[in-house]
Structures are given as structure tokens and as C-alpha cells.
Amino acid sequence: MKLRYKSTRNSQLRLTASQAIAQGISEEGGLFVPESFLDLTQQLPSLLQMDYKTLAKAIFQLFLTDFTKEEIANCVEQAYAAEKFGGAQPVKVTPLTKHGEPKFLLEL
């Protein structure tokens, strides 16, 4: 099933993920949001076991339904390539750093 996106300012305007990405913002200035929420209750245990890139691919496949699995995998691999993160292996996309007890910061 293809997930469609609607404008927050015009619920009659419905686009595919690729159309919403290409357009950016609706003519009325609204944002494009999924027209329904996905229930990930059943998938949650397996999603929590995935590394960052595998999780990104799985989530994108759920929300970007008009892209192929290969297109999504290629985009994720390019976006999270080691050279974009100082060559670190494994890539530290969102490092968690300790700043005292019990303070941690998630770097985005």
C-alpha cells in the first residue's frame, strides 16, 4: 500500500512521498505529513535490535513507499558513508556523550 501525504493546511491535497519531497511546502504554506499513522507495535522488537543504517532503511521503506528498496538503500549508504563522519567505523551518526552524572547529550 502506498502511503500518501497531505498538507497541514489543505487536507484535500494528497501527494506521494516523492511528490511531497520535490514540492517541499504546499502552496498554502503547509507541511506534508502522512495521511495516517503507522502502527509499528509488532515491528518494534526487531527495529530496536537494528544498527542505525539498517533501521534508517527499514523506517524509510515504511514512509517512502514510492521509492524502491534499492533506491532507499543507496541513499542511506551515501548519507551515512564513513568519510562524512571523519572516517569513523562504525559511523557515529548520533553519538551519546557523557556530561556528568546522570547527564548525557545526544549529538545531532
Model-derived regions, located:
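PLP-dependent amino-acid enzyme catalytic core
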Residues: 1-108
